[in-house]
């Protein structure tokens, strides 16, 4: 295919504005889905002995196994029903499950109703993660029709920013909710925290109102469900613009009927997609292995409390690291490596190898550890945005984008589940196992990323 055919298209200002209005609210919905997913980690610290590390690892592990395998159904389903319906299902379902988890804590803490927290949370979080699994496939499915292959590296960076913003919501906003709803406030509250405290009537509370960690994202997601129902469009033609050839793996097949067997065969026999899926399994281990367990390690082993910078602003650090990693990865992919994704993933995995090895030697040196986990977050979120957010569109094409991201994001959460159960078990025995567990996955991911260094999507046939 000639360079002229693959040249970046020139869009009108009106199209770019409408595309922004399409992906930005959907991106915020996706970010708040993260808040409704990882608030479990913040609740674990807030609940103390009510949720042990083993319980947390099991609940999170059950949810992530569900998330991983739900993609096998929800990816092809989203290719059939479209991304808009998928994101609406995701937002409404996740909001409802968070509402149920909040009600469970309310009954348990405020009214002393005897409930088995492990069983109830495992079931609710399982269903939460099932609905959550529609989110990533929806955002990639919709944007596959709005972004040309030469624009997708930058979109992969944007995807990384959205993930990072979601982590900021999940950790910092959830921590802010914890501070605002404590019976005995031990730190100065900012304007928003004080406002929330008065709004929900926590000023004169006699117990910590931890259930608001789940109520707040539920309310936000219900609002975005209504917003997206009116704003989001699956294709440019639904918003008054002409559809265009994005020159991905579905190029020239726009009018062909969706055939599940054909699309599954295409995805499962694509060497690059399978390798990307395995790389992303390693990404899942490394991303959650740092993101969740550092937060717990810092409190348990380093004695950092809610007022300490890294605990109070862990989400902000993840957002800055992830956003910069995502945008740099997108820039390098499109501008330096000719819209190839493998070289960027290999570069970032090389950084992760170095950091995880050093981490094993400076585990209890707070400042050095903070720098290392931030750099790993920079690298892992950049990799995830580039592979799950961009390579899936490239090699799956518009017709199979959701199925491709389903397989690949499913692999991410298979890795997440592996680390959740494994590190929950290992860290109960010795925290030194934490970085040692991560090192092999960083090496394996690097080797696989190098193997797809030259991979680039090919259109099925010339488009008209």
Listing of model-derived features with the role each one plays in the protein:
Residues 153-179, 322, 409-419:
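Glycine-rich segments within core transmembrane alpha-helices of 12-TM secondary carriers
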Residues 92-114, 350-364:
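C-terminal ends and interior cores of transmembrane alpha-helices
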Residues 339-387:
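C-terminal transmembrane helical hairpin of 12-TM major facilitator-type secondary transporters
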Residues 38-42, 171, 266, 270-330, ...:
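Extracytoplasmic gate region of multi-pass secondary transporters
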Residues 159-236:
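Helix-loop-helix hairpin linking two adjacent transmembrane segments in secondary transporters
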Residues 124-163:
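Cytoplasmic helix-loop-helix junction between adjacent transmembrane helices
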Residues 58-76, 316-329:
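Central cavity-lining transmembrane alpha-helices of secondary-active solute carriers
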Residues 80-92, 334-349:
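Cytoplasmic membrane-interface "Motif A"-like loop-to-helix N-cap segments
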């Amino acid at each position: 295919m000639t360079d002229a055919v693959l040249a970046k298209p020139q869009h009108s200002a009106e199209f770019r504005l409408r595309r922004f209005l399409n992906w930005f609210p959907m991106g915020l919905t996706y970010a708040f889905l993260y808040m409704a997913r990882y608030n479990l980690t913040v609740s674990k610290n807030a609940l103390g002995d009510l949720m042990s590390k083993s319980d947390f690892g099991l609940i999170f592990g059950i949810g992530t196994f569900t998330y991983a395998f739900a993609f096998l159904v929800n990816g092809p389903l989203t290719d059939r029903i479209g991304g808009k319906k998928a994101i609406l299902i995701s937002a409404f379902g996740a909001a409802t499950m968070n509402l149920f988890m909040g009600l469970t804590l309310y009954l348990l803490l405020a009214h002393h109703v005897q409930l088995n927290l492990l069983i109830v949370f495992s079931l609710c979080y399982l269903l939460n993660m099932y609905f959550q699994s529609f989110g990533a496939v929806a955002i990639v499915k919709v944007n596959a029709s709005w972004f040309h292959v030469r624009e997708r590296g930058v979109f992969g960076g944007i995807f990384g920013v959205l993930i990072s913003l979601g982590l900021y919501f999940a950790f910092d906003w959830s921590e802010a909710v914890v501070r605002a709803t404590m019976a005995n406030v031990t730190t100065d509250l900012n304007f928003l925290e004080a406002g929330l405290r008065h709004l929900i009537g926590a000023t004169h509370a006699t117990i910590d109102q931890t259930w608001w960690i789940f109520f707040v994202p539920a309310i936000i997601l219900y609002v975005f469900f209504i917003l997206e129902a009116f704003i989001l469009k699956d294709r440019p033609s639904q918003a008054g613009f002409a559809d265009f050839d994005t020159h991905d793996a579905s190029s020239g097949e726009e009018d062909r009927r969706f055939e599940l067997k054909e699309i599954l065969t295409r995805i499962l026999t694509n060497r690059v997609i399978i390798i990307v899926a395995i790389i992303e399994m390693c990404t899942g281990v490394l991303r959650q292995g740092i993101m969740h367990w550092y937060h717990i390690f810092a409190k348990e082993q380093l004695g950092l409390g809610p007022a300490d910078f890294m605990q109070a602003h862990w989400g902000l650090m993840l957002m800055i690291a992830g956003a910069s990693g995502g945008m740099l990865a997108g820039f390098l992919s499109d501008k330096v490596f000719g819209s190839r994704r493998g070289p960027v993933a290999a570069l970032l995995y090389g950084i992760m190898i170095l950091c995880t090895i050093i981490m094993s030697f400076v585990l209890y040196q707070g400042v050095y550890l903070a720098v290392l986990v931030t750099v790993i977050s920079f690298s892992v979120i950049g990799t995830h945005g580039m592979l799950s957010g961009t390579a899936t569109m490239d090699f799956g094409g518009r017709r199979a984008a959701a199925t491709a991201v389903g397989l690949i994001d499913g692999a991410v959460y298979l890795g997440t589940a592996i680390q959740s159960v494994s590190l929950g078990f290992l860290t109960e025995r010795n925290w030194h196992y934490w970085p040692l567990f991560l090192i092999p996955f960083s090496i394996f991911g690097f080797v696989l990323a190098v193997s797809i260094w030259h991979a680039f999507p090919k259109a099925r046939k010339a488009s008209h």
